[in-house]
Amino acid sequence: MPENLAAESEPTTDEMHTYDRVDGVNDSVFYIARPNEKSCRSVNASVFGVNTEANDNYTAFCKAIEYCKANPNITLKVDGGKYYFRTDKAIMLDGLKNVLIDADGAQFIFENPNYFHIVNCNCIEIRGLGITWNLDVSRLASLVKIRNASKESHSFELEFTELNEVSADIPIMAFTKYDPEALTPGTRQDFKENYVYQFPGSIKTVEKTGHNVLKVTHDGSLDNYTDGEVYLLRHHVYGGNAFNVYNTSNITFSGIKLYAVAGMGWLIENRSEHFQLLGCVIGLDPEHDDNRISTTADGVHIANTNGKFRISGCDFSFMGDDDVNVHDNIATVTDKLDEKTVEIYTNANNFAAGDTAIFSSKGFDRLGFSAGVTSVEGKKLTFDKDLPDYIVKDCIVSNGSIDSGNYVISGNYFHENRARGLLLQSNNGLCESNRFYKTMANPIKVIMDISSGLWLEGTGVNGLVIRNNSFVECNVVEWSAQISIFTNIDGKSADSTLFYNITVENNSFDNFYGRLVDASNVSNLNICGNRVNNKGGSYEARRGRIIIRQSCSRVTISNNEYKASVKAPFQRLIEFKNIKSAI
């Protein structure tokens, strides 16, 4: 059975709070506290100078927040309308307790990638707030068409098809090939994508050759771009995030609308717990039909928390990266400095004194050894006991004192975004009654992943139920299967079992390419009662198949229904590859 299931008792009723009950997998339950609006005093943000006519509402709104900090059990009301924020500083919510921010549909318009930083708060709710970007000042992304491409001169022209004028100094950060008719991320054939900002010097020169045309000369890495192709060119990728949430408990975001954000929608980390997104929207700004991106990176990124969260009734689309990514980070040992100290490499150091470090081999095998962290100094971790001889370079270290598991993702609509739908990399998850449509890559991915230089994330999964969801035309570019479960260690798979108790049941899958499920490193996997209809599209031999790979055991595949299709004649086949343990 899964471990660390939430089993919270119903909190004692009190005047200042209400409690939302969340029922998860295997009869788990947890509660999220919210301010009781009926018992809260009320103050209007206009008292502090927040005004739709103001050039910059930053200082006035910060004053309102400070008042709420000094006076808990309060509702801060923001009247409907548009409010500009031009100061290049974050709005800090630090130490607030029992505060409701009721925005009544107000929209905050930013022009710098500094938004909300929510730190050390407890029991707060932000309701009805819209956030967008001041597109009159700069753009987050643009549709471009390739013309006059030349391999000989390593150049092409970019026609900004929705703009009348473009500046030669507009940032060129990342290209993603788009469907030229639907204007959605990804193409079935000849998909291309380049994160040019990761390779300084790949763009040699940019010159303006027309009102809305730029000529790009490159180092040859973009020679496969051809005339007529349509791309989304991002001018911004990371660095920002509408809501940064750190070490905060019992926080609710309800009815939030993110229409154009530089960075992620939500970055929730640093041991936050008991949080929820209810009825929130990430999508294209309906007032700007030439804006083709919602958030330039992930919709929701949850890492190194204490979990117990819910995402329900939301609508996420057109992000520059995954809909939702749930995980905890890991680290690798780069050097053993003495009997009790190691140096580590990680993209997100999540350790603190008092934590328990758990060690695995470089192949993810559990070593049966853990130690308490006594100090963290940069990349150095010191422990409360001597390290055995087998703790060596390239061993993996995870933090046993954090767990982003115990979550429910239900009743949402995930669609037409770049990259994946859900990355589910933590324990005890329930993913049910969601709709997935035309995600560029696979709609659900379960992984433990070391990609050195980029990220190190995922501690394995014990307990995940994926049920009663619908998947339509997902995985446009066919990155693996609809449901993908695997490990990656810089391009290689682990040889051990790292995923346990995963169920995929009663889902419907329509008109997709590639396999239905691709699984490795999992024990007790159930794929039952799903419905597959691949009558549309074109012929492909792998469409709808299930493949079971190495380090799998106790796999049950039963009662799945397939509509006959000449486009997917082998969809009932189950493939086995590199199986080393009994099925």
Model-predicted segments: where are they?
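Right-handed parallel beta-helix/beta-solenoid
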Residues: 10-59
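N-terminal extracellular ligand-recognition/capping segment immediately after the signal peptide
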Residues: 47-49, 58-65, 72-99, 103-117, ...
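Short, T/G/N/S-enriched strand-turn elements that build extracellular solenoid repeat scaffolds
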Residues: 65-69, 85-95, 246, 264-270, ...
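Short glycine/acidic-rich loop motifs that flank beta-strands on beta-rich extracellular proteins
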Residues: 73-74, 87-90, 110-115, 135-140, ...
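Short "repeat-start/strand-capping" segments in structured domains, especially the N-termini
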Residues: 97, 121-124, 248-252, 270-276, ...
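Ser/Thr/Gly-rich low-complexity blocks that favor extended beta-strand/coil architectures
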Residues: 133-136, 142-144, 158-209, 347-379
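Small/polar beta-strand repeat architecture
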Residues: 188-240, 367-369, 374-407, 415, ...
